[in-house]
Amino acid sequence: MGSPRLAALLLSLPLLLIGLAVSARVACPCLRSWTSHCLLAYRVDKRFAGLQWGWFPLLVRKSKSPPKFEDYWRHRTPASFQRKLLGSPSLSEESHRISIPSSAISHRGQRTKRAQPSAAEGREHLPEAGSQKCGGPEFSFDLLPEVQAVRVTIPAGPKASVRLCYQWALECEDLSSPFDTQKIVSGGHTVDLPYEFLLPCMCIEASYLQEDTVRRKKCPFQSWPEAYGSDFWQSIRFTDYSQHNQMVMALTLRCPLKLEASLCWRQDPLTPCETLPNATAQESEGWYILENVDLHPQLCFKFSFENSSHVECPHQSGSLPSWTVSMDTQAQQLTLHFSSRTYATFSAAWSDPGLGPDTPMPPVYSISQTQGSVPVTLDLIIPFLRQENCILVWRSDVHFAWKHVLCPDVSHRHLGLLILALLALTALVGVVLVLLGRRLLPGSGRTRPVLLLHAADSEAQRRLVGALAELLRTALGGGRDVIVDLWEGTHVARIGPLPWLWAARERVAREQGTVLLLWNCAGPSTACSGDPQAASLRTLLCAAPRPLLLAYFSRLCAKGDIPRPLRALPRYRLLRDLPRLLRALDAQPATLASSWSHLGAKRCLKNRLEQCHLLELEAAKDDYQGSTNSPCGFSCL
C-alpha cells in the first residue's frame, strides 16, 4: 500500500476525467454508472474544502439497495455533517438522474451491463417526451391517516414504480419491514402505500421502469403539523444510560432532526411535567447529557421540537433508587432514616407555609454518606417545630435535586387523647349511672333490707328471734341487711321504740325492702298485756309497708291460730318452708347455689339451723309451761 498522498493523487485523476467528460457532455459508457455519485462528490467537495478518505467509497460503491448505501455512509459520517448535507441546496432538488445497473457474472469477474428492452417493451415502457422533459412521472397523492397509508395516483402513460422513504442526508432510506416495498402501478391507476409512522422526513418517490430514468420525489410533510404528533415521538427509540449524578439519554431518530431537551419534574403521572429553570441538556451526536443531577424517577427529560414535546422519564425499569428516606415521630423530635448506596449529602428543613410547601425555612439540617456504594443507614434527628408543618428532604451535593415533602402523622396522638377522653367520659357516666341506679332503683342497685317484726316477751323467744335473724342474714348473703330491734337495743333505748320503728319502716319503704312478721299464738296474750311495745306493734301492723310476709314456728303456732285478716298474707312455716321464704325475700339463685355449695357456708347454715331448732324446742317448752297459768291469746312473736 502506498502513502495517502500517492493514493489521493491517483484517485484525483479519475475525478478529473469525469469532470471533463461531464463538462464536455461526452458519452462514456464505462463512466455512465458513476455519473450521479461523481456529481454528488463534486458538490460535496465544493461545499466542504478537501475530499476526505471517508468519501471516496461514494465514488466507487454502487448499490441498488438504498439502505445499504445509507448505512455505509452513516457509519462513516458524523450526524452533524449529515444534517448540513440535508440542508444543502444541491441535495434538495426534486429529482435527479439515476442509473439502475444489472449485475452479470462471467469468467472475467463481476461487471455491470445495461439491459436493453425489446421493441415492444421499449414502446410500452418508454416515457413520453413530455414526461422526459419534466424529469420523471408526475403524480398526486392523498394521505389516509385512518388506515395509515398514502394513496398515489399515476397519470396515464407507462408503468411506474412508487415507494415511501425517509429522507436522510444523501439517500432516501427505506421504511422498516414490512413497509419497505416498492409497488408497480400502471398509468392512470392508484396504489396505496402503507406506512408505520407519519414523519416530517417521509417522502414519496416515483420513477419509470427504464434504466437511466428520472425519479421524482416529493417530501410534502415537513410543514404538516400531523407529522410532529404522536407518530413522531413513537418512532424515536430512547435509551437510558443514566448513572451516578449524570442523566444521559441516547436517541435513535428516523429523521435527521435536532431536538431540544431540558429537565423537568413530574409530581404525578397525570399532571404536566414542570420545566426546571437553567436545566438544558447538552446534545452531542444524539446523546443528551445533564450533569450534577439527583437521579430520581420523577426527574425527567422533556424533549421538544417546533411546537411538539415529549416527556421521557429515566429509571422506569424497576430499578431501586439510589437512596430512600423514611420518618419516625417521637415526643418532641422527628427522626429521618436515610438509606443510601452512593456518596451523598442529604439536607432537611421545615417548610414555610407562607412562602409555599416547597420553600424551606432555616435552620437546615444535613448529614453525609461517606462509605461509597455500600448500603448505609443514617439517622437525622430534627426537633419538632409545629405539628401542621411538613419537612423537606433533598440531596444538597448536586445542583438539580427533587425535594421530598414529608408531613408528620400526628393523628395517632390525637387518636390516643381522644380514646383517653372517651374512656374517662365512659367511666364518669358509669359512676353516675350506678349512683342514680342505687338512688332510683334500689332493688337492682343495692341489697334490699329485711325488717323482722316480733313480740317476744320471754328470754327463750328473744334468743329464737336472734337466731332466726342470723340464719336469714347468712342464707341471703351478698351483704343483705336484716333489721331487728334486738341488735339495736342501745339505739332503741335512746330514741324510743316507736321512733325507731317509724325510721325502720321508712328505710324499708325507701329501699324497697321486705317486712317479715313473725307470728305466735302461745304465751300470754299481748292483747291483755300492758306491754306498750306489743301494743305499738299491733297498732302499726296496718301501716306496715308492702310486701309483707308472715312466718311462724310450727311448735309455737298452728296454722289455724293465725287471725283471719292475716291469712291473706303469704305464710311460711318454719323451718320447713325456709327455702321458699328465702326465694320470697329475693335471694338470687346464684347466691343460693354458691352459699349452699361452699363447705364453710354449709357448716354455718347447718349450725344456724340446728341452733334455731333447739331454741324452738326450748321456747315451745317454756311457752307450754306459761300457758297453764294464763289463757291463750294471739301474739306477734
Curated annotation (Swiss-Prot):
Protein's GO biological process: inflammatory response
Single GO term (MF): interleukin-17 receptor activity
Expression tissues: Predominantly expressed in mucosal tissues, including trachea, lung, kidney and stomach. Highly expressed in colon epithelial cells. Also expressed in testis. Low expression, if any, in heart, liver, spleen, or brain. Among CD4 T-helper cells, expressed at high levels in Th17 cells.
Ranges of the Cytoplasmic topological domain: 436-637
Disruption phenotype: Mutant animals are born normally at the expected Mendelian frequency. They exhibit much lower expression of genes encoding antibacterial molecules, much greater bacterial burdens and total mortality after infection with Citrobacter rodentium.
Signal peptide (from-to): 1-23
Glycosylation sites: N278, N307
Taxonomy, superkingdom: Eukaryota
Extracellular side: 24-414
Keyword vocabulary terms for this entry: Cell membrane, Cytoplasm, Glycoprotein, Inflammatory response, Membrane, Receptor, Secreted, Signal, Transmembrane, Transmembrane helix
Conditions for induction: Up-regulated by its own ligand IL17C. Also up-regulated by IL6 and TNF acting synergically. This induction can be further increased by IL23.
PROSITE patterns named among the record's database cross-references: SEFIR
Disordered: region residues: 87-134
TM spans (from-to): 415-435
GO cellular component: cytoplasm; extracellular region; plasma membrane
Purpose: Specific functional receptor for IL17C, signaling through the NF-kappa-B and MAPK pathways. Requires TRAF3IP2 /ACT1 for signaling. Crucial regulator in innate immunity to bacterial pathogens, such as Citrobacter rodentium. Isoform 4 and isoform 5 may be either cytoplasmic inactive or dominant active forms. Isoform 2 and isoform 3 may act as soluble decoy receptors.
Subunit structure: Forms heterodimers with IL17RA; the heterodimer binds IL17C.
Protein name: Interleukin-17 receptor E
